[in-house]
Amino acid sequence: MSIILLDPRTINRIAAGEVIECPASVVKELVENSIDAKATAISITIERGGRNLIIVSDNGIGIKKEDMEIAFARHATSKLPDGDLTKVRSLGFRGEGLTSIAAVGKVKMVSKYRDSDTAWLMVFEGGEKTQELTPDALSCGTYIEVRDLFFATPNRLKFLRTEKAEVQSIIDMMNKLAMVNHNVMFSLFVDNKQVFKYLTQQSNIDRLSEIKTLGMEFCKNSLPVNVKEEQIQLSGYIGSPTLSRGKSSLIYTFVNSRPVYDNLLIGAVRYAYSDFIEKDKYPVVVLYLDIPCDQVDANVHPNKSEVRFQDKKLVYRTVVNAIKEVLSINLNTKLKSISEFENDHFVHASMVNSRNIGNSVSSEFFKCFQNRKPLLNNDVQKYSSKNVETDDQSLLDTNVSFCTDSKMITNKLKEERVYENSREHINKGDSKIEVSNFDILGEKKNFVNLANNLLQESPSIDSGKFNTSKKVPSDSLIDTYPLGYALCQIHSRYIISQTQDSIVIIDQHAAHERLTYEYMKQVMAKEGIKRQILLIPEIIEMNNHLDLELLVEYKEKLLKLGLLIEPLGNLSVIVREVPALFGSFDVKSLIINIVDSIMEVGDTLFLDDKIKDICGTIACYSSIRSGRKLKIEEMNAILRNMENTAHSGQCNHGRPTYVELNLVEIDRLFSRR
């Protein structure tokens, strides 16, 4: 058969197959055009999931009469006047949207240009113009009506999902566009019922509070992000680890005001949260990246939902560092667990509150202790809290930051009194932590001793201050410590402590698990990761010279992480030493995954993740268990270590380690207020 040129109608229908995949694609193209037209109010109407009818109307600048017909021509656009793809700031630029919609549906468009006195009507069916340009009535902007979608390509109808599923796709897509355009009012009607109406807002967080999938729960449990790294501006909001979900659909990323789903960004977000949530969980995040147009390529796919970054490593590092920094500061927010508690039938929502206790201990409090040695170090007295100095670029970052809580310490005099009281207890103590035989990096079996080492740091029992025979501790002691003084243990699982104006309920296993994990990170960051020499070095054949060059380039960093490799010639490398923590594992698979990680994000993150996973598992199994009875001294040892430990608000799986109930709120429970 001879080769022939396809007719324009067939060409447009083929092209429409990529651009218009479903009704949500139609809505996306039309709404993006409205946003590019500077509309401040956009209305969408849907019938039967978009199969029968889609209407999008706006109050934008409209289309000139002379441009009405050419707007439906293939690759016709007003958004690339000089044809420079490195300067694309608009959502649309390919000139395929209207052409593709008209090729598969029946389209009626009415538009009035802002300086014109008359609106004009244009009608297309199956890619053919069926009515000449005629005057029509419209106050402003553009009105587009699409009926009988895919009537010209009936095979596509077979692959559409149920009406409810298609409507949900439209809602999800509209939510994304609304998140990044808070100054635009959006309304959606489905089968004559209004689904939502988002009013014009002053800020992104106000808009996020309107969106049902996020709502006030996210706003109350999120932390703001705002950093600039070289030419990248990153802003947005990151959810508390306790808001984690089982899928990544609530990780919203926007690049230059364009909603995108990018594996690099998703991976960066997950890595930043890896110390706080389970491996199979995803955080709730909304991030806005503003990057120079010449450093990002949006012309990857016709639906424009994918991008390519010129400097992937810079983007990845910016996202990871920004999220980690905010999580380390860990501002006071409301815990998801408390939100669930409020929904209980006997508790009014306003009666219970909590701090996200990740590090809700005042930074001012810990300034008093910055000259002391780190917890659990050899020959260190009880309650010392100087941070281990580490390389802040290390992926095993142990930088400890604390937020300032005015409720904790109200003035400088109180800080000094707290310091003097704490120093008095420390100086009077005569017991030291015995961990000289605890080789955290040598043999994994020794990790099981960490629980006992932690609990052996019991406070000095002098002057009756920590005397378990006293039923009620002194007010000065309660006032001294932000997490209070332990009173009892219930069900051999939870510690109850009393502060000056609240009670604190601590999950002993979750809290101790975080203490163990953070200690392991400190030791590894300070002393390095102990390596194990392979009895028989393993030779790995690389696929190509690029893979080999990448491994050689990152050789020194891999050595710091416990992996000693050397080039052997041709395409081979020899692995002589591996991290001792790993035990028995597939060396070749590890090397391949490391290379993939380097190629994807320019870093050895796969190896870092594997080390973190092993440390997390060891921390979980070596920590005190639920059901173990503790002495008052042991309970207080846990509390003091929590106050001095980063990220102690959540265990390694993202669960809260404690909740705090204010006395005022408890009084309300009993109708005392």
UniProtKB/Swiss-Prot annotation:
Recorded hits in InterPro entries, A to Z, give:
DNA_mismatch_repair_CS, DNA_mismatch_repair_MutL, DNA_mismatch_S5_2-like, HATPase_C_sf, MutL/Mlh/PMS, MutL/Mlh/Pms-like, MutL_C, MutL_C_dimsub
What's an example GO BP annotation here? mismatch repair
What's a Gene Ontology MF term here?
Answer: ATP binding
Keywords for this protein: DNA damage, DNA repair
Q: List the GO cellular component terms.
A: mismatch repair complex
Give TM segment ranges: none
A Pfam family matched by this chain, by name? MutL_C
Highest taxon of the lineage? Bacteria
Q: Which SMART domains is this protein grouped with?
A: DNA_mis_repair, MutL_C
Disulfide cross-links = none
Q: Which NCBIfam families match?
A: mutl, PRK00095.2-2
Question: What is the purpose of this protein?
Answer: This protein is involved in the repair of mismatches in DNA. It is required for dam-dependent methyl-directed DNA mismatch repair. May act as a 'molecular matchmaker', a protein that promotes the formation of a stable complex between two or more DNA-binding proteins in an ATP-dependent manner without itself being part of a final effector complex.
Which family does the UniProt entry place this protein in? Belongs to the DNA mismatch repair MutL/HexB family.
For this entry, the protein name equals DNA mismatch repair protein MutL
Origin species? Ehrlichia chaffeensis (strain ATCC CRL-10679 / Arkansas)
